[in-house]
């Protein structure tokens, strides 16, 4: 769905085009029922006179004409395939001249959301094309765009076309928050739109995006309505799809919703299961299932997901195990025991957990252990803070030990350097004395010339000694 605004270029006055459209509708009806042209003719005549005298048109009179035209426009879905787009474009052009186009556009969108009978194969494509044109003829802040987008999503859902939905997804990702803000939708309409997108995503096979919009729809429920039947049904839908989804491991957004919290009373076993998936391990899950079979939870909404639930619980258990181990090394036997799987299957489960983004690390087949580099904390409370504190203390002691070694080595280096320097100075002094004795024997005059340099040599020795 393109972003730029579209302008329809259609020649003719309102009365001429309205009369032409009425004739076209009559032709599609094939003389069934009263003539639309004869019905609108008395309404068009005053408007034609205003156009001829160049007076300001009576918009209320136009609205009366448009009520007749739009009311009969459902028959356009039976128009020849090659004429459908141009016929709807003409109607949209007329509607934009109403005092309040929103009233008529929402009804046109309803027509387009229904099947185009003359083109079963390309009907959805034609409908989306027309709806896209309508969407882009409206100002970005026009709330009528909401109804048009709903119709587009409905057509995509009914068609089940993954291609059409893939074309819409970039616009939803980039523009939907802006649209919702610009249209100033109330909670009910925002929820309606999110659920429509979720249904279209699910029909197209994008379960992850469907779950995202179900959760966003859940968040539109006010706190004072969180215990209503509608809120309960939506909360159960959101929670069950999240539990069964192979891509959802973080339940924070769900537990924060008032409607989910209200399940404590209405669906206590389902809420208890959520708490297990949020923070507990496979042991707790198996104990829970033994006492509360899936068939008894909220009418059996999770019965078809038994295998998916157990798989997810194993991955979450391994993530918790990796996050809580102090040594960052997990033996295969420990993992096998925690996951209730054979040791030879451990590597498969570790790889699946890595793919899920819950842990990072390295498998050591020689040592039969998993070396943990990073692990995701499923919850972060007092226990986790204590673990962090313990690890920080270990790192502190390690750093203090390293610092102590560095200090010792530095002191040894300084001491040895100073000792070596002192030895060099001592050797240099002995050499100077031997040289001076030989000079006195060979050349007394040269001895006298070299005497002034002695105080400087003495000062150098003192400086070195001072350094010692």
Swiss-Prot record:
| Record-linked Pfam families | eIF3m_C_helix, PCI
Keyword Cytoplasm listed? The answer is yes
Q: Where is the composition biased (Basic and acidic residues)?
A: 430-442
Keywords tagged on the record:
Cytoplasm, Initiation factor, Protein biosynthesis
Q: Where is the PCI domain?
A: 206-377
Region (Disordered), start-end ranges = 40-61, 419-468
Q: Where in the cell is it found?
A: Cytoplasm
SMART domains in UniProt: PINT
Instruction: Return one GO MF term.
Output: translation initiation factor activity
Cellular component terms, GO, for this chain's entry?
eukaryotic 43S preinitiation complex; eukaryotic 48S preinitiation complex; eukaryotic translation initiation factor 3 complex; eukaryotic translation initiation factor 3 complex, eIF3m
Q: Which domain of life is it from?
A: Eukaryota
The protein's role, per its UniProt record: Component of the eukaryotic translation initiation factor 3 (eIF-3) complex, which is involved in protein synthesis of a specialized repertoire of mRNAs and, together with other initiation factors, stimulates binding of mRNA and methionyl-tRNAi to the 40S ribosome. The eIF-3 complex specifically targets and initiates translation of a subset of mRNAs involved in cell proliferation.
State the family named in the UniProt similarity comment for this chain. Answer: Belongs to the eIF-3 subunit M family.
The protein in question is named: Eukaryotic translation initiation factor 3 subunit M
Organism in which the protein naturally occurs:
Aspergillus fumigatus (strain ATCC MYA-4609 / CBS 101355 / FGSC A1100 / Af293) (Neosartorya fumigata)
């Amino acid at each position: 769905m393109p972003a730029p605004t579209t302008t329809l270029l259609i020649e003719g006055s309102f009365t001429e085009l309205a009369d032409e459209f009425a004739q076209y509708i009559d032709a599609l009806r094939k003389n069934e029922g009263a003539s639309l042209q004869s019905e609108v003719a008395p309404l068009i005549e005053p408007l034609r006179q205003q156009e001829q005298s160049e007076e300001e048109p009576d918009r209320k009179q136009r609205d009366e004409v448009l009520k007749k035209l739009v009311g009969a426009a459902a028959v356009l879905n039976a128009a020849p395939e090659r004429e459908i787009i141009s016929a709807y474009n003409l109607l949209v052009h007329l509607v934009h001249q109403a005092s309040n186009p929103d009233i008529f556009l929402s009804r046109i969108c309803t027509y387009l959301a229904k099947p185009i009978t003359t083109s079963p194969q390309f009907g959805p494509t034609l409908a989306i094309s027309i709806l896209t044109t309508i969407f882009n003829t409206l100002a970005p802040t026009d709330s009528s765009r909401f109804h048009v987008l709903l119709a587009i999503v409905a057509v995509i859902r009914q068609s089940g076309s993954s291609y059409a939905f893939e074309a819409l997804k970039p616009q939803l990702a980039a523009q939907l928050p802006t649209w919702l803000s610009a249209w100033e939708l109330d909670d009910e309409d925002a929820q309606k739109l999110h659920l429509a997108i979720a249904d279209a995503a699910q029909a197209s096979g994008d379960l992850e995006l469907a779950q995202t919009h179900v959760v966003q729809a859940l968040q539109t429920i006010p706190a004072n309505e969180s215990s209503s039947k509608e809120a309960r049904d939506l909360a159960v839908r959101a929670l069950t799809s999240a539990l069964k989804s192979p891509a959802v491991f973080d339940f924070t957004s769900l537990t924060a919703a008032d409607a989910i919290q209200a399940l404590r009373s209405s669906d206590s076993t389902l809420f208890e299961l959520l708490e297990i998936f949020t923070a507990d391990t496979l042991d707790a899950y198996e104990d829970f299932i033994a006492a509360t079979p899936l068939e008894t939870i909220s009418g059996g909404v999770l019965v078809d997901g038994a295998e998916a639930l157990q798989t997810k619980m194993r991955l979450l258990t391994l993530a918790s195990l990796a996050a809580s181990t102090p040594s960052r090394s997990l033996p295969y036997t420990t993992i096998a025991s925690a996951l209730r799987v054979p040791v030879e299957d451990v590597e498969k489960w570790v790889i699946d957990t890595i793919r899920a983004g819950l842990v990072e690390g390295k498998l050591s087949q020689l040592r039969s252990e998993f070396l943990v580099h990073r692990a995701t904390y499923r919850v972060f409370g007092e226990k986790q803070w204590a673990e962090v504190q313990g690890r920080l203390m270990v790192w502190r002691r390690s750093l203090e030990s390293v610092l102590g070694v560095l200090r010792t080595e530095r002191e040894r280096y300084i001491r040895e350097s100073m000792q070596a320097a002192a030895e060099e100075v001592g050797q240099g002094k002995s050499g100077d004395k031997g040289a001076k004795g030989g000079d006195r024997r060979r050349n007394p005059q040269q001895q006298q010339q070299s005497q002034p340099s002695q105080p400087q040599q003495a000062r150098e020795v003192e400086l070195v000694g001072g350094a010692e």
